[in-house]
């Protein structure tokens, strides 16, 4: 009650002293003084009706920070006390603030902006009950603009910007405690008329300035402000008419806003003079990089114009044709500035992605042709500049960003064969593809690492450890270039082949020369590293482009040979000699050109052969002890390509295609020598890599991924197991022989997965038995041998014992990852034996966090991969094992003091995994492919006992075990906290009937968790807890037990939610969740609700506030009398609650 207790001069003195403290350097004031000063301002801003005091402060104080706080206090109080204020006093307050700013041109910018924001908030709050409109403000602003005084014009711009910012978004708007729906409604009203008015005022200013020849600095500054304002208007995210509150937030969070105005904007934006003005403005200011960004952004927004503004297709065609003409006139024949690249590419990208294809093709054909030629020229030019940026290692990669956008635009165009005939874009595709290849090859064929003047850049290129792999970093670019390569396959496939063949011949020659030098004089050889490095880099890019051209990266789908590649091979198959093709494919050690008739081979297979030849040169260098000269990156590229290729082409399933190329089906089809040979070759490559490159983790990882590809499809696995070296690999891995035992844990895990998948290939019973004996049995035997030693407890911390245990646990994760519906029976039974032993290991290794973590991970993997296939008795076995694991974990960790941050971090990791385990178990309730243990017939002695325990029971029991471990400190880890509350909410929503049946301690812990989440956690967690309350209250209403613990708990929550909605300032996004919970709780406890309202009203001393509150509550209650769990009534209540919150929401948060 600060303002009421003291006179204005005393208030000013107190605030100015507090401001001095806050502005003082940290060395001059202590924490306590700072907090006291902050408290003074907070208390001042919450004081009741501070308007007179604030006016006095604004007129007399000279301290900027105090002025800023006075403006903020006015803004907050106006909204808070809106229903208590007379219309006249609000109007005079608004006039006072505007006049105040006009009369003080030298105000600090942040103070002026805050005062104008207060004006905008007053206008916004008044727009809804029609008590204030923008007309008078626009009239004032219009006069300010026409004054011709730059300072006054700048102020006019600030007023319009404040209005725009306040109305533009319901999420970025001032936090004035009103609902999303309120902000959405204000925005809709504003965007129809007032926004257009602002745009018209802005356009007038821009027209005036664009006509002037010379602008001084002050004029330029005004021009820039209005251009930025135009950009703000054109980037407005127009709200559609009937969007619910949930969607408003989603709609407004979209990053790239396209221009979709309502019909009422038709006359304004379809006037061709508006578009021409923005092109004129850009031509005038393009050399000023800051202004050019705004003008290009305005044009990019106009290029995205769509929606009801166009009355018909004809108007769209006219607009687009006009725009493209303007664009070509602006950029043809000029040297594009760095600052223009991204803007121009955004304009082109918007034109291509926003305008329907039939509109694009309806513009005059010459104009369209010029547009595509311009796109081709810009793509090649930006590509070259992007390569230069890479060489110069620039921080701001503007050309790279622009190039990416243009390549995406190409992808949109060339994938449309409905509107463009085949071959329409071939010549353009050739140009863009050639330019990409040229930028990525070393001189003399290419321009890689050449600076602008053609000089080679720095010799040694440092590659950071953290740098992303090119194939990931440039995956979008490569996908677009690969697609363009397919469009122009006639040119691109032979080009890649000749470039690769020529480089692999040079690489072979270089390595041979070096070998001869070594033999002639060991130890004295010098290597031309520059030449080798250039070759490796060239081969790297050529393999990446080939991989993206020949195959797609499909996640979870069956990859198909791209139709363009299939058609290209079929078209030329009559010119192809199959035998020569097979000979070239099967002779990676030979130069293609040394094989008679080599020009009559299938071009796609010859391109594959070129890469197999790279692989062969690498293998021969390894055999010749030249590994130190090889590039691990090239090794990675080779196996990455072979994996990608094998997934798509190897043992091609002819049923998936209308027609198939004869060379493909002969070389890689089912039951062919070619496929058997290739599988043998790839397998040998895998084995060689795992021996030679075991220390190169990324390369080893790519290698085992290739192995998984060879066995994940049964048809391929059938051929793999016929190779003798597959069995040798399995034996070698099972016996933990070097060098396989040196592989990193993730690689060993994936290798185990591959070996298990291979075991489900087609074999006779005896062979299959022998295979499992050689792959899985040694794992079991060695594990049991280690843990059953008498002195295992004493030896368990020895390094070799720990390594054995870790390797086994990693292998178990790999086995679980190999689960499929047809192998789950064997794998589950095998893994269950281990799970029981793993629980014993938890005891032994309770003080070895990384082992504990890995044991939990085994359970997580088994549950994740297998639970959905398990019938009741098997699921029970797994539930029991998981609960025993949690019991042991809980017992070992309860009451344990976590001394340092590392220990806390470790427990955080454990608990995160346990949350994942419980969530995986809970998924059984939704995803269940089991057929009463059907998949286990023949593997299951005896019948399941008649037990019926649901996944929910198990998960709740699991929660009970870990709840005591969830300390306040651990809940400070946001990820863990969110996971924990998501799990609890999930259970309450899906199984509310289980909650009342919980043991008393668990029930209390759960209720305490919900209360903690609502009162002390993030708004996201609070929302989750509110969402959990609704189903619990509904469950209570169904059960009609008025003395149950849940009934009593919900009564307590009614008070919490009531206080949150009425007495506390809360995040308005939570109003919906809080409202739904509140309504359900009110239905359940109507008498208590009336009591809460009465208590609140009786505490009000101010009769005006009392009456307003009483009216608001009566209106709220009347919306659903008596409240019942009926959807219609609930919706009516929620709507009234929105209104209630708008009117009295902040009224009681006053000091």
From Swiss-Prot:
Is Transport found in the keyword set?
yes
Give GO terms for biological process: positive regulation of protein export from nucleus; protein export from nucleus
- Indicate whether Protein transport appears among the record's keywords: yes
Q: Where would you say this protein principally sits, based on its record?
A: cytoplasm
Q: Which InterPro entries match?
A: ARM-like, ARM-type_fold, XPO1_C_dom, XPO4/7-like
Q: Which UniProt keywords apply?
A: Cytoplasm, Nucleus, Phosphoprotein, Protein transport, Transport
Q: Where is this protein localized, as stated in its record? A: Cytoplasm; Nucleus
GO CC annotations, alphabetized? cytoplasm; cytosol; nuclear pore; nucleoplasm; nucleus
Q: Which GO terms describe its molecular function?
A: nuclear export signal receptor activity; small GTPase binding
Q: Please list the residues that carry the modification Phosphoserine.
A: 464, 521
One Pfam match: CRM1_C
- Which family would the database say this protein is a member of? Belongs to the exportin family.
Cited function: Mediates the nuclear export of proteins (cargos), such as EIF5A, SMAD3 and isoform M2 of PKM (PKM2). In the nucleus binds cooperatively to its cargo and to the GTPase Ran in its active GTP-bound form. Docking of this trimeric complex to the nuclear pore complex (NPC) is mediated through binding to nucleoporins. Upon transit of a nuclear export complex into the cytoplasm, disassembling of the complex and hydrolysis of Ran-GTP to Ran-GDP (induced by RANBP1 and RANGAP1, respectively) cause release of the cargo from the export receptor.
Report quaternary structure and partners.
Answer: Interacts with Ran and cargo proteins in a GTP-dependent manner.
What is this protein's name?
Exportin-4
Q: Which organism is it from?
A: Homo sapiens (Human)
Q: Coding gene?
A: XPO4
């Amino acid at each position: 009650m600060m303002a009421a207790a003291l006179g204005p001069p005393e208030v000013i003195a107190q605030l100015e002293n507090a401001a001095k403290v806050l502005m003082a350097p940290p060395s001059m004031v202590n924490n306590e003084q700072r907090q006291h000063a902050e408290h003074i301002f907070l208390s001042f801003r919450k004081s009741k009706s501070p308007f007179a005091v604030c006016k006095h402060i604004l007129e007399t104080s000279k301290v900027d920070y105090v002025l800023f706080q006075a403006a903020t206090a006015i803004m907050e109080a106006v909204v808070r006390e809106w229903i208590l204020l007379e219309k006249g006093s609000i109007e005079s307050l608004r006039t006072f603030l505007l006049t105040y700013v006009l009369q003080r041109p030298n105000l600090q910018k942040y103070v002026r902006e805050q005062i104008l924001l207060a004006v905008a908030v007053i206008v916004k709050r008044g727009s809804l009950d029609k008590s204030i409109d923008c007309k008078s403000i626009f009239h004032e602003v219009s006069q300010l603009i026409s004054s011709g005084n730059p300072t006054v014009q700048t102020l006019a711009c600030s007023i319009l910007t404040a209005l725009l910012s306040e109305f533009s978004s319901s999420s970025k708007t001032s936090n004035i405690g009103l609902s999303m729906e309120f902000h959405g409604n204000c925005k809709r009203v504003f965007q129809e008329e007032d926004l257009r008015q602002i745009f018209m005022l802005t356009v007038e200013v821009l027209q005036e300035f664009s006509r002037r020849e010379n602008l001084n600095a002050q004029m330029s500054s005004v021009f820039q402000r209005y251009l930025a304002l135009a950009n703000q208007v054109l980037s407005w995210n127009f709200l559609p008419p009937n969007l619910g509150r949930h969607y408003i937030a989603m709609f407004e969070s979209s990053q790239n806003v396209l221009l979709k105005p309502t019909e009422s904007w038709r006359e304004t934006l379809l006037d061709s003079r508006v578009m021409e003005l923005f092109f004129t403005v850009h031509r005038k200011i393009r050399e000023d990089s800051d202004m050019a960004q705004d003008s290009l952004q305005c044009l990019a927004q106009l290029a995205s114009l769509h929606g009801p503004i166009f009355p018909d297709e004809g108007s769209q065609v006219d607009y687009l044709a006009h725009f493209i003409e303007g664009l070509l006139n602006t950029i043809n024949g000029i040297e594009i500035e760095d600052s223009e690249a991204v803007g121009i590419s955004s304009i082109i990208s918007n034109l291509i992605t926003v305008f329907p294809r039939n509109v694009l093709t309806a513009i005059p054909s010459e104009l369209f042709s010029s547009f595509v030629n311009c796109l081709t020229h810009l793509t090649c030019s930006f590509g070259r500049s992007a390569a230069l940026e890479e060489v110069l290692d620039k921080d701001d990669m503007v050309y790279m960003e622009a190039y990416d956008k243009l390549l995406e635009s190409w992808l949109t165009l060339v994938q449309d064969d409905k509107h463009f005939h085949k071959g329409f874009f071939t010549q353009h595709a050739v140009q863009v593809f050639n330019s990409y290849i040229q930028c990525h090859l070393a001189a003399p064929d290419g321009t890689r690492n050449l600076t602008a003047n053609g000089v080679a850049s720095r010799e040694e290129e440092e590659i950071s450890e953290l740098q992303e792999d090119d194939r990931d970093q440039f995956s979008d670019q490569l996908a677009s270039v690969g697609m363009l390569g397919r469009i122009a396959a006639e040119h691109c496939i032979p080009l890649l082949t000749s470039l690769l063949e020529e480089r692999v011949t040079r690489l072979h020659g270089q390595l041979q020369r070096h070998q001869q030098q070594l033999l002639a004089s060991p130890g004295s050889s010098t290597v031309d590293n520059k030449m080798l490095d250039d070759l490796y880099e060239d081969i790297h890019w050529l393999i990446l482009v080939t991989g993206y051209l020949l195959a797609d990266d499909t996640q979870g789908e069956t990859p198909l040979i791209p139709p363009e590649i299939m058609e290209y091979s079929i078209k030329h198959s009559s010119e192809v000699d199959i035998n020569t093709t097979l000979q070239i494919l099967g002779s990676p050690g030979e130069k293609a050109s040394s094989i008679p008739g080599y020009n009559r081979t299938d071009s796609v297979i010859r391109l594959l052969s070129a890469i197999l030849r790279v692989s062969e040169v690498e293998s021969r260098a390894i055999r010749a002890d030249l590994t130190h000269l090889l590039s691990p990156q090239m090794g990675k590229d080779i196996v990455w390509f072979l994996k990608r290729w094998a997934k798509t082409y190897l043992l091609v399933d002819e049923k998936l295609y209308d027609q198939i190329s004869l060379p493909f089906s002969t070389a890689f089809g089912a039951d062919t020598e070619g496929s058997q040979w290739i599988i043998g070759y790839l397998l040998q490559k895998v084995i060689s890599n795992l021996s030679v490159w075991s220390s190169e983790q990324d390369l080893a990882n790519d290698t085992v991924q290739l192995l998984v590809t060879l066995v994940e499809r049964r048809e391929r696995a059938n051929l793999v197991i016929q190779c003798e070296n597959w069995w040798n690999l399995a034996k070698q891995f099972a016996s933990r022989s070097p060098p396989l035992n040196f592989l990193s844990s993730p690689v060993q895990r994936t290798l185990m997965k591959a070996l298990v998948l291979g075991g489900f290939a087609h074999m006779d019973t005896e062979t299959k038995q022998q295979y499992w004996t050689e792959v899985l049995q040694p794992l079991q035997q060695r594990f049991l041998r280690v843990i059953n030693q008498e002195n295992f407890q004493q030896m368990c911390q020895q390094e070799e014992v720990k390594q054995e245990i870790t390797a086994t646990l990693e292998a178990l994760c790999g086995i679980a990852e190999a689960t499929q519906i047809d192998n789950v029976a064997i794998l589950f039974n095998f893994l269950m034996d281990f799970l029981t032993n793993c629980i014993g290991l938890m005891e032994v290794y309770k003080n070895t966090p990384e082992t504990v973590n890995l044991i939990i991970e085994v359970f997580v993997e088994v549950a994740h991969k297998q639970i959905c296939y398990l019938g009741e008795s098997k699921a029970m076995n797994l539930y029991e094992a998981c609960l025993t694991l949690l019991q042991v974990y809980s017992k070992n960790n309860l009451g344990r003091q976590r001394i340092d941050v590392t220990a806390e971090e470790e427990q955080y990791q454990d608990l995160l995994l346990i949350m994942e385990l419980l969530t995986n178990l809970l998924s059984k309730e939704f995803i269940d492919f089991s057929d009463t243990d059907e998949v286990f017939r023949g593997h299951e002695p005896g019948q399941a006992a008649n037990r019926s325990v649901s996944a929910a029971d198990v998960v709740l029991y699991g929660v009970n075990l870990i709840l005591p471990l969830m300390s306040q400190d651990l809940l400070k880890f946001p990820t863990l906290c969110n996971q924990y509350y998501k799990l609890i909410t999930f259970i309450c929503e899906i199984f509310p009937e289980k909650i009342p049946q919980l043991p008393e301690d668990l029930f209390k812990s759960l209720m305490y968790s919900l209360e903690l989440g609502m009162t002390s956690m993030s708004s996201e967690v609070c929302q989750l807890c509110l969402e959990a309350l609704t189903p619990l209250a509904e469950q209570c209403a169904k059960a009609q037990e008025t003395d149950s613990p849940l009934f009593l708990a919900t009564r307590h929550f009614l008070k919490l939610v009531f206080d949150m909605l009425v007495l506390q300032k809360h995040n308005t996004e939570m109003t919906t969740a809080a409202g739904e919970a509140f309504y359900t709780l009110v239905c359940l406890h109507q008498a208590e609700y009336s009591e809460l309202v009465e208590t609140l009203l009786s505490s009000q001393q101010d009769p005006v506030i009392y009456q307003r509150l009483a009216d608001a509550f009566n209106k709220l209650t009347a919306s659903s009398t008596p409240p019942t769990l009926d959807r219609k009534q609930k919706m009516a209540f929620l709507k009234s609650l929105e209104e209630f919150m708008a009117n009295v929401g902040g009224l009681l948060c006053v000091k």
